[in-house]
Amino acid sequence: MNTILIGIAGGTGSGKTTLTRHLKEHFGKDVTVIGHDSYYKRQVGRTYEERAKVNYDHPNAFDTDLLIRHLQELKAGRSIQCPVYSFVEHNRTDQTVEIQPAKVIIVEGILIFQNPTLRDMFDIKIFVETDADERILRRALRDVEERGRTLQSVVSQYLTTVKPMHEQYVEPSRKYADIVVLDMPLLDTRTKVGDLTGHLVSETVMEVLSFAASREHTTSERQAEGIR
């Protein structure tokens, strides 16, 4: 299977998941989506309070080696057992989800361009850039509503780990992107957010298709040269 591997990076709350969802809707059943968040390391022997204080925005928080091995398996046409992470418990669960190979594999996460080995696996690298104020608002809403966090804990985590790690690791990885998506203002009532989202996604889809076509053309040329 000639698999296209797409990486979508960007800061917390930048819109990575939204973009991923729209791309998946566009490409349909030929897409598999994997989140780097699923590969947070298991916190063995730590209490809930200790797990809550872990710096989850540092590269060492992730089992990226396992993700790399899983992507290699998928590209080779073999299914994987993807870990399941609980944001409520701050820990990996004992469950896994079977993921099948697909023509297009999308990997999303804040630090997927930070690791050179993982970064070099992507055929197309997309970075979603959004204003920091908008990102913290989105994160606060998400964590309070979906992950059982308090507003105080969200703000504390943002100031102590999220913001410093973004500046040290996430933002510098933007330079590796083939495509940079500038997200719309979250609270700008003067624009039609739905129209802007559709426009951004349409543009991104066209760029992805262009990169994919270019990649296939280059691969065909190399194969032809090998035959000669």
Model-derived regions, located:
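Short hydrophobic/aromatic beta-strand immediately N-terminal to the Walker A/P-loop
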Residues: 5-7
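P-loop (Walker A) phosphate-binding loop of NTP-binding proteins
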Residues: 11
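Conserved lysine of the Walker
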Residues: 16
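Hydrophobic positions on the alpha1 helix immediately C-terminal to the Walker A/P-loop
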Residues: 19, 23
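Post-Walker A helix-loop "phosphate-sensing" segment adjacent to the P-loop in P-loop NTPases
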Residues: 25-34
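Conserved nucleotide-sensing/catalytic segment adjacent to the nucleotide-binding pocket
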Residues: 32-33, 41, 45-89
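ATP-dependent NMP and nucleoside kinases share a basic, alpha-helical "lid"
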Residues: 94-147
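NTP-dependent small-molecule kinase module
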Residues: 100-101, 163-228
